[in-house]
Amino acid sequence: VVEELDPFLEEEVRCLGISVKGKEFFPAVGELNPEIVENGAVQAGILPASPKPSLKSRVSLLQLPARPPLFCPGCPHIATEFSLRRLGFYNPSSTSDLPSERKAPAQLKKSGLIVTSDIGCYTLGVYAPLLALDTTACMGASIGQALGLEKAGVPNKIVAVIGDSTFIHSGITGLIDIVYNQGKTTVIILDNETTAMTGHQDHPGTGISAKGAKTRAVSLEALVRGVGVNDVNVVSAFELAAIESTISRCVESDEPSVIIVRGACPLRVRTSGTPLAVDKEKCDSCYACLRIGCPAISVSEDKGFIDASLCVGSSCGICSQACSQKAIVESKQ
């Protein structure tokens, strides 16, 4: 049996009275990769020992470019992450300067935002090109970290980012702490109407029970008002200007605020509009479209290029809103 971490399947098979082997040849910690599996198979006698270079050596010879995890095309989290970056996380003196490299902490200006993140698809915003997040610890930690930074006297404006299912799971008590301790942290709840990262499970906010039956959905708006937050905002996940203006206002407030950014996960709803395309006559090669981190966007002939087979089209449209030249339009093909 080849399995990562604990020998769960191995032990279950052994309980059936079947002779089984596994952890004698494969590690109980860490992540499996082709080289580890190959070595284990050789030790088990499944594969012959080979004089050829190991898989790791052969792969390294290919010198493949790194491919970090990416958001899906049409992900409702992209606009919020892009907005947090564009609002001046690392360069608050300008809303248009989008440096490609992450600056060292010593270079962070005091007026910049600090963004504490949580566990979910939105955690991918820590990677380039977005580089929008500062912390990730465990489920529900983002809100407590944000309040802790505020109460410790950190001069920066602080925003906590958390998903809808994670907020219901372990974020509510953190929000209560903000209200109870008279904090003024802004909490952004990214509501994609599912638990996407672990397989699109439903949660109390979706109105579908664990058995798949319709039930009463928990209203996030009513919930956060119920714990004492007066400044509650709901914005579309695909309205870039609305997201940016709401965040800008809330972080300047002297009371707690919650922004619910709502938009369905495209992998669940499976809806799309007309694919978008780049008008090469209008494109000035500023590559602002690349900085939203959408895998449907690349470069062709020094101009932005959108892969129509990946683009969810006008049902998203974040790239067209980010383009200052209005060069991204609906495809005519």
Predicted stretch roles:
Residues 1-3, 20-23, 50-54, 114-118, ...:
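General beta-strand structural signal in soluble alpha/beta enzymes
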Residues 1-52, 328, 333:
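Terminal amphipathic helices with adjacent charged low-complexity linkers/tails
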Residues 6-10, 29, 79-80, 122-126, ...:
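Flexible loop/turn segments at secondary-structure boundaries
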Residues 8-15, 249-299:
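Glycine/aspartate-rich loop-and-adjacent alpha/beta segment that forms the canonical ThDP
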Residues 12, 284-305, 316-333:
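Iron-sulfur cluster-binding cysteine motifs and their immediate structural context
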Residues 52-142, 152:
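Active-site diphosphate/adenylate-binding microenvironment
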Residues 98-106, 310-329:
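Short Fe-S-cluster ligation motifs
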Residues 124-260, 271:
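Thiamine diphosphate
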